[in-house]
Amino acid sequence: MTGIELHGKELEMLQYECHVSGAIAPKRPNMLLISENKIDYQPKSAIILCEQKIIRRQLRRARNDLRILSIEAYKSINNIEIIHSNDFETSEWMEEQRKLGKIDGFITSKEIFESLKFNGRRHTLLPDPKEGGGAYFLPIPYSDLIILLTRKSSPKSLTRVMTEKEGETIWWVQNQILGSLTSQELANTSILVRHRKVKSLMEEAERYKDLTLEQACHDSEGEVVDSEVHVELKIEKISKNGKRTIGIHRIIPYSKFEYATISLIRDWEVILREVSQDVPQDSYHDKIATAFIDLEE
């Protein structure tokens, strides 16, 4: 089953005497923009439809002069009363709207794009910008993550063949960070967890001139540690208008990722608490500043 289907249902899983015995790493975690133009080349006020709240906010962050609408909002504005039973029907309808010229593009998954064999151009919303400061798009929670559920009596030799080390890492980290979140909190959260080799991290640090990233690849004595896989973890929340982002980014040696994840969760909770409350007056001359970001919107 998918990771999002298991979210919040672990107690029910235990009642059926099942447990997570492994996971398969996402092969297609990134969403696609179906449009003739990339996001950077969209005309001003272009209409882009997107069902995922956090992706809409990422698009507004990249281009605040576009009309990024949910499907429900678009139907309401245009008095459309069509009801779709699943994501495939919704994507087919959005493709028809695009071909008719009523919208400029829409967001869908790679699975739906390949299943429906759309003819339009596709542009992958990648988590790594082409250059420093460029637009980037972190995946939605549990994106394309497949979980292996088995009963306790199931042979472990069978699951070892199917499961993947990176998939297990992604599930464990995301479940620790997101497992207690409500669906509303989950909707405004994007997260990226992946295994990285030191060589690729060093190349990225050199490309972006990122000294912090480069230091993460050295040990306490300054030597490059090239024998161990690292776990990269990024998590973000974005304001409704896309103008304010809070996030945390960690590069963790695989041997320490469990302890480091618990530490990250504590740091993330502190960050969320601090940025979501009003800033008190330092003196009677000051005005109370509003919170940096509203986590409820």
Please identify what each model-predicted range represents.
Residues 23-24, 37, 72, 152:
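Residues at the C-termini of beta-strands that transition into short coil/loop
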Residues 6, 37, 110:
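Residues that line or immediately flank small-molecule/substrate-binding pockets and catalytic motifs
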Residues 1-30:
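Short beta-strand-centered segments that line the small-molecule binding cleft or hinge
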Residues 56-297:
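Small-molecule-sensing regulatory modules
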Residues 31-47, 66:
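Flexible hinge/capping segments at coil-to-helix
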Residues 25-26, 38-42, 99, 138-141:
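Solvent-exposed alpha-helices and their adjacent loops that cap or buttress functional pockets
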